């Protein structure tokens, strides 16, 4: 896996790649139920132009933020993935949508590394926000789960529906 850099906005040149990543991603079928639930609960993501940059917002959730993973090399660097998240409730950063580029997925239809790196970046951000104790992932191939920001007792995550 190529090295990645993470940023909250990307240039307008990435608009087609981002549209494909968010709206036409072939792997969405593997987490379809979770995607549908997230859309019904929080609203649809949309790409917005801000000066010369692109951001992603979610219609029903003011305050959503996005983080993009770009290849550290290349001209231009390849868009590897994105994660859309928000603070909800006050002690949790909730990951609403997580997408990985078709080009970064391995032959066995998985690329856990870029997914793990995106989630880890959200976890690092959460550590810097006072009062945030959890990162909640709404959907994955194994269902919902929560990751503690400061693990206690050797447990690294809690699976199942959020309580």
Which positions does each model-derived feature cover?
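Short glycine-rich, low-complexity/disordered patches
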Residues: 30-51, 130-141
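A conserved beta-strand-loop-helix scaffold within acyl/acetyltransferase catalytic domains
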Residues: 37-92
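Short, intrinsically disordered/low-complexity patches at protein termini
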Residues: 42, 118-119, 158
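Conserved catalytic-core motifs of GNAT/GCN5-like acyltransferases
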Residues: 152-163
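Acyl-donor binding region in acyl/amide transferases
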Residues: 88-152
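Hydrophobic, Leu/Ile/Phe/Ala-enriched alpha-helical segments that form helix-helix packing faces
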Residues: 22-26, 71, 122-130
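Conserved N-terminal entry element of GNAT/NAT acetyltransferase domains
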Residues: 1-30
């Amino acid at each position: 896996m190529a090295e990645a850099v993470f940023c909250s906005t990307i240039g307008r040149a990435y608009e087609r790649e981002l549209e494909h990543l968010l709206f036409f991603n072939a792997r969405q079928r593997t987490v379809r139920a979770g995607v549908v639930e997230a859309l019904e609960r929080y609203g649809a993501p949309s790409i917005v132009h801000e000066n010369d940059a692109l951001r992603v917002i979610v219609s029903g959730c003011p305050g959503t933020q996005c983080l993009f993973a770009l290849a550290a090399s290349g001209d231009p660097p390849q868009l590897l993935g994105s994660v859309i998240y928000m603070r909800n409730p006050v002690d949790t950063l909730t990951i609403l949508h997580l997408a990985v580029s078709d080009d970064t997925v391995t032959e066995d239809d998985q690329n856990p590394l870029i997914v793990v790196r995106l989630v880890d970046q959200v976890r690092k951000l959460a550590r810097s926000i006072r009062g945030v104790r959890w990162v909640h992932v709404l959907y994955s191939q194994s269902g919902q789960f929560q990751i503690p920001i400061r693990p206690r007792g050797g447990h690294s995550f809690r699976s199942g529906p959020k309580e």
